[in-house]
Amino acid sequence: MTSPGAPTEPHCGVCGAACPPPFRAPAPEIAPDLDLRPGEPTRSTLPDWIATCRRCGAAAPDLTVLPPEALAVVEADAYRALSGAHPEFALPFLRWAMILRGTGDRAGAAEAMLQAAWSADDAADSINAARWRAEAAFLWGEPADVETALRRIDVLRRAGEFDAATAAADRLAGRALDQTSASVLAFQRARIATRDIGRHLISSAVPPPAHRPHVAARQRDRRDVLGRLFRNPRRE
C-alpha cells in the first residue's frame, strides 16, 4: 500500500501501464550543431530521449502526459506497421512523430523526425538520415521564427536538397537578422554553394567573443537568436 505523501508510480497515458519516468539528459558542454543537436555529453544520450510503453507501444519523452488523441494513433495499422518498415534504432522517434502528427502538432513532429535523422547519423545510415531530414523540413513548412528557419536551411542542406536550401536562404536573407543569425546564414550559403552535406558546429559559423562583452552588449545578446548558445558550451 502506498503511504501518504509517497511519490506515485508513473503510468502510460494511453493504456495505464507502469512506465519509466522521463529521461533527464546531462547539460551539454560542447557547442551544438547548426541544426541545434546538442553537444556532448547530451549528444550521446539520444537513444534515451524517447520512452516506449511495453504494453501498448506508445512512444513519447513523457508517456504520462500523452493526450487522449494518442490512443487512436497507437491503435492504427499505420502505427503498428512502423516496426517492420524501419530500423529499430529510429522506431521511438518515428512513433513519436506519428503521434504528434495525429494530434496536429506539425512542429513537434518535425523535431521528432529530425531526431530520427540524428539516430540515422549515428548508425551511419545516410539514406534514411537524408529522407527523415527532408520530412522534417516539410513538416516545418515556412517557419515564422528565425531560429527555426536557420535550422530548416541546415536540414535541407544536409539532406542534399540544395535548391530548396538556396531558396530558403534567399527568403531569410530578406528579413531583419541579428548579427549572429546573419553570420550563420552566410556560413550556410557558403556550404550550400560547395554542395556540402556535412555536419558543422554553430561555433564554426560564429566564433564566440574573445573577451567578456560590455553589459550593454550582453543585454543585446539576450535578444540574439543564437548568440545565447555560446554562454555555456565550450568549443570542440
Could you tell me what each predicted segment is?
Residues E161-Q179:
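TPR/TPR-like (Sel1-like) alpha-helical repeat modules
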Residues D77-W96, Q179-A182, H211-G227, E236:
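Short, intrinsically disordered terminal segments enriched in charged and Pro/Gly residues
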Residues D48-A51, E111-A112, E147-T148:
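Short, well-structured alpha-helical interface segments that form or flank functional binding sites
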Residues M1-E75:
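N-terminal cysteine/histidine-rich coordination modules
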Residues A123-D125, L156-A167, F187-L226, N232-E236:
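Alpha-helical linker/edge segments of TPR/alpha-solenoid repeat scaffolds
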Residues L63-P143:
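Extended interfacial segments that mediate partner engagement and assembly in macromolecular machines
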Residues W140-A149, G174-R189, P213-R220:
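Boundary/linker segments of alpha-helical solenoid repeat arrays
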